[in-house]
From Swiss-Prot:
This is Nuclear receptor subfamily 2 group C member 1. It comes from the Eukaryota. Induction: By ciliary neurotrophic factor (CNTF). Repressed by vitamin A. Induced by retinoic acid. Changing residue 170 to A: No effect on sumoylation nor on DNA-binding and little effect on binding KAT2B. Greatly reduced DNA-binding, binding to KAT2B and activation of the RARB promoter. It comes from Mus musculus. Pfam families: Hormone_recep (PF00104), zf-C4 (PF00105). Changing residue 167 to A: No effect on sumoylation. Changing residue 568 to A: No effect on sumoylation.
């Protein structure tokens, strides 16, 4: 870092200087001096002055007749700072004050979203966060960002904004018109201040949690030693965005950060309207949602005929639908030769041919972007909701699943959504950064222990569930399971006939047997030397039944949708037309 004296010499000799600050490592800011042209050719001397400090430099002419100027910087300032003093200014006070933008070095207009920035960087950051824009860098993600080149790489500019303290949570949602209802918008449906144990995850978290009992301490120590739980800190988080989104898909995968919350909010608003028009009737729809009751009767019929359900999922479509259509098959291709039965038909048709095709192998998850500096409940809940929706879309893309009829399809997904979701966590382990999410849960439980906000029994059940999740995902990752194997494992789980209340259980059992036969054939052809691979994979499925669906909801979804049960949302998703899903299963390839 150049000294003040060196900077002064550069300013005098060249009328142009360069300042390199600690806050802007590798970033150069050009300062054009305010010297009067009439003073050119005169000799300036670095003069000592009473009260001068190492941070001050006085410039004067030999005859002391020139314009005295003082350039100084202060190490306690959060941004580069430049002041000019002249003899003409009253009481030798500062007549010009410059605060430099920490992002690009332009003249700052104040503190915006937690950092001193110019109006340009302020507006750029606000637009990027409000619209959830995703950028990609054409270089090596270390582009120079300054006043003249700040618009060349939006990715590096946004990363620089976040790195220098601009807070995404400080950006408010766009305000609605006055005539619109004052209820929170979908983007505000899940506040970052409301998390499942009421702790703000934006603050740095402790590296190693401690626990009450010795047994819990031993288990947690082994968990951390395995390397699956990582410390939560800014540098660890910031190195990951490149793997969350492929650069060529980045621009086409933009969407709101509250898909599940938007669906629940839309359904709740529809329910309120229905309740107002039928006052004094049965249980309100909103209460039915919270209780998990899905027998809405006429309500379902009305909102489906009016197309309101489809509009309720507009946000989901934006989040999952890209501009490219080549990455997935067209609805006509996917449904060719497959039966489509209306709910309530007495007959069931078994589809000929294989249960799963190559189109069912792809399982592409689009993560919310940009990734926050510290994980919060909104980001975790949104990531989990996208995985849940994608799992349901995958099930609906199977013709044999549609052949079961609407009621059986709903019953199967309601019974086994937790198992499908857990398999999805293992499959998307790296893309979702599940190890960091689980470590966040552990740290939050540790904090609740210190603050005595949770009963020991509840804390123990949550911790055991987290350990089961970690152990299951860890074992699946070690087996190096490919996309075909995950697809067959999900099909075997989905077509389980042992759930009470299912109709035509014989057909469901035949579908499961068909999935097993195709799975066995694939393993034999692909891994001929691994005799026990099929057995090892199938033996992982019983562990899925140990996962408590209620605890999964509390960990991953409660902060986003409150007390609304996943069971109550599933029927609305599955009653959409199958063709609507084929164009939405798209994103970052695993």
């Amino acid at each position: 870092m150049a000294t003040i004296e060196e900077i002064a010499h550069q300013i005098i000799d060249q009328q142009m200087g360069e300042i390199v600050t600690e806050q802007q490592t590798g970033q150069k800011i050009q300062i054009v001096t305010a010297l009067d042209h009439s003073t050119q050719g005169k000799q300036f001397i670095l003069a000592n002055h009473e009260g001068s400090t190492p941070g001050k430099v006085f410039l004067t002419t030999p005859d002391a007749a020139g314009v005295n100027q003082l350039f100084f910087t202060s190490p306690d300032l959060s941004a580069p700072h430049l002041q000019l003093l002249t003899e003409k200014s009253p009481d030798q006070g500062p007549n010009k004050v410059f605060d430099l933008c920490v992002v690009c070095g332009d003249k700052a207009s104040g503190r915006h979203y937690g950092a001193i920035t110019c109006e340009g960087c302020k507006g750029f950051f606000k637009r990027s966060i409000r619209k959830n824009l995703v950028y990609s860098c054409r270089g090596s993600k270390d582009c120079v960002i300054n006043k003249h080149h700040r618009n060349r790489c939006q990715y590096c500019r946004l990363q620089r904004c976040i790195a220098f303290g601009m807070k995404q949570d400080s950006v408010q949602c766009e305000r609605k018109p006055i005539e619109v209802s004052r209820e929170k918008s979908s983007n505000c449906a899940a506040s970052t201040e409301k998390i499942y144990i009421r702790k703000d995850l934006r603050s740095p978290l402790a590296a190693t949690p401690t626990f009450v009992t010795d047994s819990e301490t031993a288990r947690s120590a082994g968990l951390l030693d395995s390397g699956m739980f990582v410390n939560i800190h800014p540098s660890g988080i910031k190195t990951e965005p490149a793997m969350l989104m492929a650069p060529d898909k980045a621009e086409s995968c933009q969407g709101d950060l509250s898909t599940l919350a938007s669906v629940v909010t839309s359904l709740a608003n529809l329910g309120k309207a229905k309740d107002l028009s039928h006052c004094g009737g049965d249980m309100p729809v909103v209460q039915s949602l919270r209780n998990g009751d899905t027998s809405f009767g006429a309500f379902h019929h009305d909102i489906q005929t009016n197309g309101d359900v489809s509009r309720a999922f507009d946000t989901l479509a934006k989040a999952l639908t890209p501009g490219e259509s080549s990455a997935c098959q067209s609805p006509e291709e996917g449904m060719e030769g497959s039966p489509h039965l209306i709910a309530g038909e007495p007959s069931f048709v078994e589809k000929e041919g294989p249960l799963l095709s190559e189109s069912h192998v792809a399982f592409r998850l689009t993560m919310p972007s940009p990734m926050p500096e510290y994980l919060n409940v909104h980001y975790i809940g949104e990531s989990a909701s996208r995985l849940l929706f994608l799992s349901m879309h995958w099930a609906l893309s199977i013709p044999s699943f549609q052949a079961l009829g609407q009621e059986n399809s709903i019953s199967l997904v309601k019974a086994y959504w937790n198992e499908l979701f857990t398999l999805g966590l293992a499959q998307c382990w790296q893309v979702m950064n599940v190890a960091t999410i689980l470590a966040t849960f552990v740290n939050c439980l540790h904090s609740s222990l210190q603050q005595d906000k949770m009963s020991p029994e509840r804390r123990k059940s949550l911790m055991e569930h987290i350990f089961k999740l970690q152990e299951f995902c860890n074992s699946m990752v070690k087996l190096c399971i490919d996309g075909h194997e995950y697809a067959y494992l999900k099909a075997i789980v989905l077509f389980s006939p042992d759930h009470p209340g299912l109709e035509n259980m014989e057909l469901i059992e035949r579908f499961q047997e068909k999935a097993y036969v195709e799975f066995q054939d694939y393993i034999t052809r692909t891994y001929p030397d691994d005799t026990y691979r099929l057995s090892r994979l199938l033996l992982r499925l019983p562990a899925l039944r140990l996962m408590n669906a209620t605890i999964t909801e509390e960990l991953f979804f409660k902060g986003l949708i409150g007390n609304v049960r996943i069971d109550s949302v599933i029927p609305h998703i599955l009653k959409m037309e199958p063709a609507d899903y084929n164009s939405q299963i798209i994103g970052h390839s695993l």
